[in-house]
């Protein structure tokens, strides 16, 4: 329910857009005449898109903190992120071309997206995250996979017959970075708190989220290293131990696409610069 165009529509009054404002209060607030909070056949979840409030990074963090706080004010309410592709204009220092137009098959856009996913999970506390769109014919940063005719980087909008019968398939690093989350973090898993994270400073360094599968005693840690230096961490589990003190890394970088590596010790987990790494292990 909701499908808000951006997170701020969920928690505040939008100038000149009363019909889009304060959607959490409207649908689930105790004082709302339109509240559906007590309808047993409606899932107690509000949804919104991750667009627009992603740059500068300080706004990305602040908006996620605000929507998380608002969701927590309604007992039992959860938040889904239901649509995102690159549409902002952060400049060429962040992504090739500086904005959404102009597809990017490389790691810069992949890290841009992975940062948003990580912060949506860790800061906004979303319980579901979706991308727009799977396959794109356009010269735009909207596809996990792109198709083209070999002569250009994509069609002009409206050309429905572009690559209709033949063409080339191009995978993106965004596809693989997305897989660092989606291949390993599954429904029913529980997110594990990582204490003492400064989300703002982490956003240009290393962002961490962790999850556990209680039934199978499985542990997953996803690290997004936005920085230019290798970072090393020691994994300490509160109330448990890492089986055999080891985890298997899966790395997406400029030279790797979800590449499985050799087992690493839990007391020396290394995250290469400009990479997304998923560590998978078991716990006792």
Model-inferred region functions:
Residues 238-257:
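Solvent-exposed beta-hairpin/edge-strand motifs
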Residues 199-242, 274:
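Carbohydrate-binding surface patches
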Residues 262-284:
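C-terminal beta-strand-rich structural cap/linker in extracellular carbohydrate-active enzymes
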Residues 59-67, 94, 144, 193, ...:
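Composition- and surface-driven signal marking solvent-exposed, interaction-prone regions
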Residues 3, 50, 83-86, 130-133, ...:
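Active-site proximal loops enriched in glycine and acidic residues that flank catalytic Cys/His/Asp
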Residues 78-183, 192-201:
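Aromatic/acidic polysaccharide-binding cleft in carbohydrate-active enzymes
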Residues 1-116, 123:
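Noncatalytic carbohydrate-binding groove/subsite architecture in carbohydrate-active enzymes
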Residues 186-192, 244-245, 266:
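Glycine-centered loop/turn motifs
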